[in-house]
Amino acid sequence: MDKQLIAERFAKARNTYTREALVQQQVAGKMIRILTDVLSSAEHLLPEEIAVRFRHIVEFGCGTGSYSRILLHTLHPETLLLNDLCREMEECVGELCSTQTAGRKKDGTEIRVSFLPGDAENFDFPKGTDLITSCSTLQWFNNPETFFLRCHHALTKDGILAFSTFGTKNMHQIRCLTGHGLYYLPIEELQALLSPYFNILHAEEEIVPLSFATPQAVLKHLKQTGVTGTEKRMWTRGRLQAFCEEYIRQFSSPPTGNVTLTYHPIYIIAKNKE
C-alpha cells in the first residue's frame, strides 16, 4: 500500500473531511458509547471510574480530531497522544495540544495532549498505555497482526485496544465497477488475529447505506473525505461516463433514482492478555 499517496490524499481533504465524513463521525460517537458501555458491564465500572481507568491514551489515525475531542471530553485522561500518518493533521488538532484547550481533570491535573506524525505501523507506543484506540483507520494497515502485537507490548496488563474499521462490504459498489479498492478483513479474521494477545470483550458490525443524487456526487464525496488514497488511475471522460452509466444501472433505487454507497463499520473492544 502506498502510504505516501494515502497521506497526500488525506492532506488535500483535511478542510472538507469534517463536513463530508458523516459516517466516520457517527462511527466515532458510537465507538465511545460502546467502549464505555462494555467497560461498565464487563468491569462493573461507574462512568467516573472509567475515566480513572484510562489515564494514558494513544489514538492512532486521529485525522481531523473528531474522535479525539470525544475522547478528551468523555474520558479526561492525564495524557493523550495523537498520531496520524498525515503531518498536516497537526493543523486540525493543534488547539487540543494547548493546555488551555485540553483542560484539567477534576483533581486539577492538567491534561497533556501531544501530536506524533508518522506511520503507526512503525511506532512503538509508550509502555504503560491504558488505552490504544482509533476510528476508521486500521483498514489502511499492511500488517494488522504485527500491529496488534506492538499494542500488546505497549498496553498495561489489563489495557484496552478499542477500534473501528471497515468490513468486506465497504464501498463494494466502487470495487465492483472499477475493480479497485482496499482489501477489507472480515470481523472473524480480525478476532482471530487479535486472539493470541487479547480477549475480545465486544465485536459487532453494521451496514450503513448513503444515498447520492448522482454517481458524480459519490466520487466528489470520496475525494473530499480522502478515501481515494489507493486509486492512481486518471478519470478520462470516457471512463467517467462508463462508470456513471453502470453505477446508475446497478445501484440506483426507485422511485428517486438516487444511487447508493455502502459503508460497513466494524467495532472491536479487546482486553490485553498478560
Curated annotation (Swiss-Prot):
Annotated signal sequence range: none
EC number per UniProt: 2.1.1.197
Catalysed reaction equations from the record: malonyl-[ACP] + S-adenosyl-L-methionine = malonyl-[ACP] methyl ester + S-adenosyl-L-homocysteine
Pathway assigned in UniProt: Cofactor biosynthesis; biotin biosynthesis
Listed GO MF terms: carboxyl-O-methyltransferase activity; malonyl-CoA methyltransferase activity; S-adenosylmethionine-dependent methyltransferase activity
SUPFAM superfamilies in the cross-refs: S-adenosyl-L-methionine-dependent methyltransferases
Family matches, as CDD domains: AdoMet_MTases (cd02440)
Alphabetical keyword list: Biotin biosynthesis, Methyltransferase, S-adenosyl-L-methionine, Transferase
Role, per record: Converts the free carboxyl group of a malonyl-thioester to its methyl ester by transfer of a methyl group from S-adenosyl-L-methionine (SAM). It allows to synthesize pimeloyl-ACP via the fatty acid synthetic pathway.
Protein name: Malonyl-[acyl-carrier protein] O-methyltransferase
Organism: Bacteroides helcogenes (strain ATCC 35417 / DSM 20613 / JCM 6297 / CCUG 15421 / P 36-108)
Name of the encoding gene: bioC
